Structure formats: C-alpha cells, structure tokens
From Swiss-Prot:
Keyword Secreted applies: no
Segments of this protein annotated with the region Required for interaction with LHFPL4: 679-699
Glycosylation sites: 98, 136, 522
Annotated source species: Mus musculus (Mouse)
Annotated gene: Nlgn2
Function: Transmembrane scaffolding protein involved in cell-cell interactions via its interactions with neurexin family members. Mediates cell-cell interactions both in neurons and in other types of cells, such as Langerhans beta cells. Mediates cell-cell interactions between Langerhans beta cells and modulates insulin secretion. Plays a role in synapse function and synaptic signal transmission, especially via gamma-aminobutyric acid receptors (GABA(A) receptors). Functions by recruiting and clustering synaptic proteins. Promotes clustering of postsynaptic GABRG2 and GPHN.
Bias-annotated ranges (Polar residues): 824-836
UniProt-recorded name of the protein: Neuroligin-2
Signal peptide bounds: 1-14
Gene Ontology MF terms: cell adhesion molecule binding; identical protein binding; neurexin family protein binding
Topology feature Cytoplasmic, residues: 700-836
C-alpha cells in the first residue's frame, strides 16, 4: 500500500511540476496540443518559467475548446527609471504563474477629450462598455494573451480545380500552428488587447491567436527629438512581444517561422511601420493591415517636440534642457501625465510614432519607395465608409447636409491640412468640384454621401492604394480588399456604410457566438456566413500567404443558401489592374478601386500644391498664429537642422482675416442674384476652373520632363564614400560655407559628386510620388532628406534662427556648420534620434 501511495504522490507532483502540456525543463519542447485539451488548467513551460492556462468551451458546436493563457509577461515592467525607455526582457519567476485572468490595461484616459473622428465606431458608440475593459490600469501593463486551439478542425473538402465535386479530404494541420499577433488600434491613445477574444478565430481557423497591451499616449510615444527621449516605445513593446513569441511560441504548439501580425486603424499603421523597421526583421513573415497605413495624416507625428513642450508646461516640467525635462516627467505619476489634455491639430496626433532614424529610420513612404518591405507578404484593405465619424457632425438632419454645411466642412478640412492661404483657395474649390454630384447637386443626402467619400478617400483609400502599389511595384505578394458590410445595431444611421472598425467582429468571429457588450448587434445567418468567410481568408493567408489556400470557402453548416465566395478566386493586386476583392453579401473581384478619386489625391492635389509653392515662394505669409509655435530668441543649445520659421512679416491689410470667411460658393448656390449675374458668375467660375486645370496640366508635364531628366542624369548609387554616385566628398569639412555655396554643395552631393553639372544642381529636386507635405499639419516641421541625419543637442530650447530658403519645397536644408560636438551624416550608433 505504501508503495502505491508513493506512486500516486509522484504522479501528482509530476503533473504540477511540468508533467502537463509543455512540461519539462525550460526551453524544452512542449507537449502535443491534444494534451492541452485534456486538462482544465494545463501548464506550459516557457523560457522564463511555467504558466497555467484555462480551458474554455465555446458557445458553438462546430468550435472546439480553446486554452487561454491570459496576462503572460513579455517584458519587464516599465516603471521608474524604465519609463521612456525601450522594453527589456522579463525576469524569470519561480513556480507556476497563474495566467487565467486578463492583465491590467496600459494607462489611458477615456473621460477626457477623445479623438472620436479617428476611433472605431464600435468603440465610440459603446464607451461605457469599453471603459469596463480599462478600469484596471497600471503602468505595469506589458502582457499578452494567447488563445490556443485544442482540435485541428473538421474534415473539409480540398480545393481542386479539375474536380467539380471533390471528396472529403483530411487537410487538417496537426503540426505546429501558425501564429497571428493582433495589434489593437485607438489612435495610439486608447484601447487594450483585452477587448478582443481570439478564441473563435483560433478554434475556427486552427491558428494560435495572440493579443497584447503596449504603452499608449505620452507613456508610449513621448519624444524630445534627442537622446533624452527618442520615442516609439509603444512600437518597441510590439517588437519585444514578437521576440518573446519567436522564443517561446513553440512551447504552446506554435510555429515561430509562421508568425503574422495584423491590426486595425492605428494598429494597422503599426503593422506597416514594423514592416519597415530593421528591428523586427526575421520576427514575422506576413502582415495584414485593416484600415490603416503608415502614410496617412494621422499615422506619424512629425512635430513631437511641440507636444512634449506643451505637456511639460502643463505639469511644471518646462525646462530648457531636455534631459532635465524628461527626468522631471519621470517623477510625475502616470495618472498626472495621462490626464493632461494635449490636443493635436485636427486629423493628426499628439503622441504617436516618430521618424527617429532607428526604429523608423526614415519617412515611411521613402522607405517603401526603397523597397524595404520586400520580405513580407501583405494583405491590406479598407471599409466602404471609413469616414462616418467625420460626417456625423455635419449631418444636420435626416435629409442630409446643406450646401453651407458642405462648404464649411470642406473648407475646415482643407484649412486643417494645408498651411498656405493662397494655395488653400485653389485646393478648396478643386475639392468641392471633384466631390459635387453635378447630376443631383441640390440633394442633401447626396452631399452627405460625397462628403463621406471625401474623408474616406483622403484618409484611408488613397494611402492604402498607394501602399499596395508601392509593394506590388517590387513584385511582392499583396492582396487588396474592400469591406462592404456591417451588422445591424441600434443608434447606427440607416445611411451609414461599413465604417471604421466594422470589420473587426467578423475577423474575430463574434457572430458565431452571439452579440457582446462591445458589439451589441443583431447578427443574422448572413453575418455568421460572412464571418466564417473572413476568418477563412485571414487564417489561410497566415498559413500560406495565399487567402485562397489551403482551406476552401464552405459554409453549408450555417444555412442551405449557397456561399457565393466558393466560386471566387481572390487575385493578387498588381500595379496595372489593381485587383481587389469586394467582401460583402455579393462578393466579386474587381479592379481599380475608386481610381479617379485616388488619382485625384495622389496625382493632381500634390501638383496643385507644388504649383502654389512655386508661384508664391517669394511672398510666403505667416500662417495663423493659432497653429504656429511662437518664435523665441535662439538659445545656445538649439540645433540648426530644423526648417526655419517663415519671415515674421505681416500680410497686407487685405489679407488679414477679420472674421469668418464667406467662401465662394459653387455657381448656382446664390439664388438671390439676378439671372444675368448668376450666368456671369457661372461662366467666370467655369473659366477659372479650366485655367486651373490647364495650369495643373502644364506643370504636370513640366514636372514629368524634369523627373525623366533627373533619372537620366542620376548615375548609379555608390557605397564607397557615402555620397550618391560614389564620388568623393566635397571639400567643405574644414570651413564654413556661405549659404549659397552650401546649397550648391548639397545639390551636387545629391546629383553625383563634383563631376555633376552645377547648372543641373540648381534645378529643383524630383518630388516624391505622394507628396510628404500633404500628410503634415500646417505647422509641421519637415523631415530631412534620406542620409542627412544629425543628432540634435540635448535641449528643449527655442527654435534656431532661420537659414536661407530651400531651393525646393521638398528638398533638404543646408547642414549646420561643424562644431566640437557635431556628428557626421551617418548613424553614429544603433539608436539615432528623431528628426524634427
């Protein structure tokens, strides 16, 4: 008997000490997934210790159980001196760590002024429910949640083009599971991975789903532009989570060689930025970007120092030295920092990713043009009516938008995005013209529809198409979709299309298990079918890089209606046809999504902007003081690498804004005038618009000729000297050049060295395809050119005195004269600083 008792005690101890799934020594192989489903609280070993999960049954007979590991630490808590620092690997823990409850959310403020126009509709419509997920907040928040399937999925038919009725074939994947890491959105200010239960997606798609918390707002993205606080801590948190997965996911039955990152909104922007960062190289293989890119106006913060100053002043940390200011901010409580109301320019962000020369080494578009994302398969798309929140405030009634409200909204949109008064008049009228339905221009509902399309096209569609095209230009696999469905929920206007974030419940399989507090919809069988379709596409892509393979579309288990997606083959996006999949109840593969409007934003608007800047370079006026950082006397620690403020000359009396402007209406809007005057105004406006188009065409042709000339004259890049073309460095290191010689020297460097033609060096540089300035706020400081990185001194002092004007609005600025503490134009070490 005593021998039997000893044996039983030994078995129990073995189960507690690692005899369960993933048991054994840390770093050893985990056990099979089948054993995970046999225990109520399975234990898995990781490189840092053992964790105990919990087995959950799902409310659907076709879905197998899922083991959840909630609140697993992937980094050391960023407390004290670790605030405003990159994350570190977690410390090991003794015994078995309980991972059965959700972790705390990162500090955020849902009760302050929210950027509602940028947040998902389901979030803003259910703020009380969303608040329950972030009630438990802590700066110690760097945790992830893992959802591991316990079954390999049902038998299904294997796609066979040659067989009309293929037999049931076992294509279940019993090996290592693909891994899908979800990056939540929320304008980099709100949200948590706890809001998204990955159980249904894991069980239905036979993948391991992971969600995480990363630092948000000021704690995740504050930047001073120098070594004191480089920023991008939230992105570094995501990279650290990927490192943890690469090291540990095999213990949970996952495949570290098949990791896919996916996100929505700001999370999708993070996906794009991680694709472009060398820090994440080799940590994942595929990427899905839902309604977000790295080249939207809200994706990157181009003026972080401005908002850092504002925050520091609000909490009593306004110091001239940036190191002292950051140390002061470290001593403040997280709640005091998070609760400060620091409002960005409309359509922009106050705290978000910055171009630091390291994590984000250059402007995202420049990196994409250089082919920095060739190693990743990509799936990207948008929803039909992303800009719903932009329009709701302008919708005065159920009858739509009045003509005056339409004009005001467009004017406000242009005023907040473009910083030159003369150019805005041209852009404003051109945008109104393009987004007026001339067949039914007096219809308020049609005005509302076109206004919704305007915001959607500018903020989501055009950047997404540009990103997909840049990817496809390098023959890299990319799939594009448009989502045309949303669930029926109370409070949603009948005229609303699929808005920002409406695809998320279908991606996570919410219709299969019923409505939740965040998604209180009346889900129908069609919703269940569409969710199954989306999950199949997403998990197929995670498995093979092809959303069509290996699992075909088959939803006969839901209802007897045929699934139209069974006959659809999702084609790759290419630069010519630009194919995309229309995801809705009537799916179809089409090409050139909103091609006219996309070309308008990507081609015509940048040239109109260039036209203005070239015509008015000698008469640039100071933008409104409300959007400009006030000038100060230069301090001793101020860098000279920043764009100078415009000359402090007041505009002529006729240009001073004395009140609300009565913007010109479209011809025919002023019905109080006589017929003759109306005809005169109509003809005049038409001629004006034709002149604008003619000028735009002329300048476009001139720019194309100039671009071709630049390409012909540009020699192949060299690598020996660090100068484009491989020529020797210009002899300017020992002396300070006059401004004119500095400009010529810089243009000669870009043109190919000393041997280049000086006359050609004085020509404007070739502008980028998608003008960078159009994504910045009116008072944003532009980026330096690629390869022109310099370290900013440690100071939060006032801006420097203005250097001579640039030869081109998008060209580089002359480098500062060398000093005892200055650096060369190469990155001095792995951590460079923000270019502001």
């Amino acid at each position: 008997m005593w021998l039997l008792a000893l044996c039983l005690v030994g078995l129990a101890g073995a189960q507690r000490g690692g005899g369960g799934p993933g048991g054994g020594a840390p770093g050893g192989p985990g056990l099979g997934l089948g054993s995970l489903g046999e225990e109520r609280f399975p234990v898995v070993n990781t490189a840092y210790g053992r964790v105990r999960g919990v087995r959950r049954e799902l409310n659907n007979e076709i879905l197998g159980p899922v083991v959840q590991f909630l609140g697993v630490p992937y980094a050391t808590p960023p407390l004290g001196a670790r605030r405003f620092q990159p994350p570190e690997a977690p410390a090991s823990w003794p015994g078995v760590r309980n991972a059965t409850t959700l972790p705390p959310a990162c500090p955020q403020n849902l009760h302050g002024a929210l950027p509602a126009i940028m947040l998902p509709v389901w979030f803003t419509d259910n703020l009380e429910a969303a608040a329950t997920y972030v009630q438990n907040q802590s700066e110690d928040c760097l945790y992830l949640n893992l959802y591991v399937p316990t079954e390999d999925g049902p038998l299904t038919k294997k796609r066979d083009e040659a067989t009309l009725n293929p037999p049931d074939t076992d294509i279940r994947d019993s090996g290592k599971k693909p891994v899908m890491l979800f990056l939540h959105g929320g304008s980099y200010m709100e949200g948590t991975g706890n809001m998204f239960d990955g159980s249904v997606l894991a069980a239905y798609g036979n993948v391991i789903v992971v969600t995480l918390n990363y630092r948000l707002g000021v704690l995740g993205f504050l930047s001073t532009g120098d070594q004191a606080a480089k920023g991008n801590y939230g992105l570094l948190d995501q990279i650290q989570a990927l490192r943890w997965l690469s090291e540990n996911i095999a213990h949970f039955g996952g495949d570290p060689e098949r990791i896919t990152i996916f996100g929505s909104g700001a999370g999708a922007s993070c996906v794009n930025l991680l694709i472009l960062s060398h820090h994440s190289e080799g940590l994942f293989q595929k990427a899905i970007a839902q309604s977000g890119t790295a080249i939207s106006s809200w994706s990157v913060n181009y003026q972080p120092l401005k908002y850092t100053r504002l925050l520091a002043a609000k909490v009593g940390c306004d110091r001239e030295d940036s190191t002292e200011a950051v140390e002061c901010l470290r001593r403040k409580s997280s709640r005091e920092l998070v609760d400060q109301d620091v409002q960005p320019a409309r359509y922009h962000i106050a705290f978000g990713p910055v171009v630091d020369g390291d994590v984000v080494p250059d402007d995202p578009e420049i990196l994409m043009q250089q082919g920095e994302f060739l190693n990743y398969d990509m799936l990207i798309g948008v929803n039909q009516g992303e800009g719903l929140k932009f329009v709701e405030d302008s919708a005065e009634s159920e009858d739509g938008v009045s003509a005056s409200a339409f004009d005001f909204t467009v004017s406000n949109f242009v005023d907040n995005l473009y910083g030159y008064p003369e150019g805005k008049d041209v852009l404003r009228e051109t945008i109104k013209f393009m987004y007026t339905d001339w067949a039914d221009r007096d219809n308020g509902e049609m005005r509302r529809k076109t206004l919704l399309a305007l915001f959607t096209d500018h903020q989501w569609v055009a950047p997404a198409v540009a990103t997909a095209k840049l990817h496809a230009d390098y023959q890299s696999p990319v799939y594009f979709y448009t989502f045309y469905h949303h669930c029926q929920a109370e409070g949603r206007p009948e005229w609303a299309d699929a808005a920002h974030g409406d695809e998320l419940p279908y991606v996570f399989g919410v219709p299969m298990v019923g409505a939740t507090d965040l998604f209180p919809c009346n889900f129908s069988k069609n919703d269940v079918m569409l969710s199954a379709v989306v999950m199949t596409y997403w998990t197929n892509f995670a498995k093979t890089g092809d959303p069509n393979q290996p699992v075909p579309q088959d939803t006969k288990f839901i209802h007897t209606k045929p699934n139209r997606f069974e006959e659809v083959v999702w084609s790759k996006f290419n630069s010519k046809e630009k194919q995309y999949l229309h995801i809705g109840l009537k799916p179809r593969v089409r090409d050139n999504y909103r091609a006219n409007k996309v070309a308008f934003w990507l081609e015509l608007v940048p040239h109109l902007h260039n036209l203005h800047t070239e015509l008015f370079t000698t008469t640039t006026r100071l933008p409104p003081y409300a959007t400009r950082w006030p000038p100060r006397t230069p301090g001793p620690g101020t860098s000279g690498t920043r764009r100078p403020p415009p000359p402090a000359t007041l505009p002529p009396e006729s240009d001073i804004d004395l009140g609300p402007r009565a913007y010109d209406r479209f011809p025919g809007d002023s019905r109080d005038y006589s017929t003759e005057l109306s005809v005169t105004v109509a003809v005049g406006a038409s001629l004006l618009f034709l002149n604008i188009l003619a000028f735009a065409a002329l300048y476009y042709k001139r720019d194309r000729r100039q671009e071709l000339r630049c390409r012909r004259l540009s020699p192949p890049g060299g690598s020996g000297s660090g100068v484009p073309g491989g020529g020797p460095l210009l002899p300017t290191a020992g002396r300070e050049l006059p401004p004119e010689e500095e400009l010529v020297s810089l243009q000669l460097k870009r043109g190919g060295g000393v041997g280049a033609d000086p006359a050609e060096a004085l020509r404007p540089a070739c502008p980028p395809d998608y003008t960078l300035a159009l994504r910045r706020a009116p008072d944003d400081v532009p980026l330096l050119a690629p390869g022109a990185l310099t370290l900013l001194p440690s100071g939060l002092g006032p801006p420097p005195p203005p250097p001579p004007p640039s030869l081109h609005p998008f060209g580089p600025f002359p480098p500062p004269p060398p000093t005892a503490t200055s650096h060369n134009n190469t990155l001095p070490h792995p951590h460079s600083t923000t270019r502001v």
